[in-house]
Amino acid sequence: MISDRQLSILNAIVEDYVDLGQPIGSKTLIERHKLNVSPATIRNEMKQLEDLELIEKTHTSSGRYPSESGIRYYVNQLLQETSHQQQTKMQRLKDLVIENHYDLSSTLSDFANELSIASQYTTLVMRPNHKQDIINNIHLIRANAYLVIMVVVFTSGHVEHLHLASEVPLSNDELTKISNFVTAKYNEWNNHRFENELNAFVKSDTEKDFIKDMLNMIDIHFDNQSNGIFMGGKVKLIDALNESNVSSIQPILQYIESNKITQLLDEMSNTSINVKIGHEIESSLSDISIVTSEYHIDDRLKGQIAVIGPTAMNYQNVIRLLNTIW
C-alpha cells in the first residue's frame, strides 16, 4: 500500500511519461503539476516508489519511468475510479449500422477505423457470433442461369448477401416457396424432423439437394464470419513503438494477425473494461498493452473491441472511450 502523495506522484509519472516519452525528474513533476513540496521531498518519495518496483531509473538520466508493475497499479486505480462514474453511452455504432444499410462487415470496419482515430491507437473489432442473432428472412433471387443470390435478413436488421452457384431450373415462384420454407425451418434443419418435413415439402431430389446446399452455405459462411476481426490504424502501433523497440514489432504484428489474439479476446470477454499489460499478454510482448471491452449492436448481438498500443498508453482516454461505447 502506498500513501496518497506517493499515488499522486506515481500517477503523474505515468501520465507525464505517456505525454513526453522520456524519464521524468522531480523538477518536471513540480513544474507540470504545481506541487507545493520541495524537490528533495519528491526525490525521496520517488526513491520509495523505486524500492517498491513501481518506477525504474535509467542509467543515462536522473529521471524515472513507470515499471510494468507501476503501470498496472495506475491502471487498477483508474479502473476503480471509472467503474463508479456514470457513463453517457454513444449512439455512433448504431448510426453506422444505418449508414451502412445494415451491412455488418462495413459497419464494423468503419467502427474500427473511427475508434482508431479517436484513440490514436490500433484497434480490433471482433465480429459477433452469428448464433447470437436470429434469421428473420431469406430471399432467393435468380441472377442468371448459373447463380442464385441469397439475401439473409436478421432480426437485428443487418443483411448478408450470399452467392449460390446452381443450375437447378427453378422459377421465381418456386424460389419464393423455398425461401419461405427455409426461413421457417432454418433453426430446425439439424433436427431429425427436418428430413421428414423436407420430404413432405418437395419430391424432387434435385430440389432437396438445392435446399441442403443453401443451408450448408449459410452455416459455413457464418462459421467463417464468426472469427472475423476488423482492424483500424494498423500503422499506429508501429508508429507508437520507439525506434529502440523495432525488433519487437514483428512478433507483435504476428500475434495480432494470428488466432492467439482471438483466443485472448475470448478470455477477456466481459461487459467491463479489461486491461492486459506487457508480459501479462505473452513474454515476447512486453512492449504493448491491450484494453478490451464489449460492444452491443442490440440486446442480442454483441462482440469484443480491443485497443492496442505501447505500455505507455493514454489509458485514461482509451478507458473513457470504451466506457461510452454501446
Swiss-Prot record:
Negative regulator of class I heat shock genes (grpE-dnaK-dnaJ and groELS operons). Prevents heat-shock induction of these operons. PANTHER family: HEAT-INDUCIBLE TRANSCRIPTION REPRESSOR HRCA. It comes from the Bacteria. The gene is hrcA. GO terms for biological process: negative regulation of DNA-templated transcription. Pfam families: HrcA, HrcA_DNA-bdg. Belongs to the HrcA family. GO terms for molecular function: DNA binding. It comes from Staphylococcus saprophyticus subsp. saprophyticus (strain ATCC 15305 / DSM 20229 / NCIMB 8711 / NCTC 7292 / S-41). This is Heat-inducible transcription repressor HrcA. Keywords: Repressor, Stress response, Transcription, Transcription regulation.
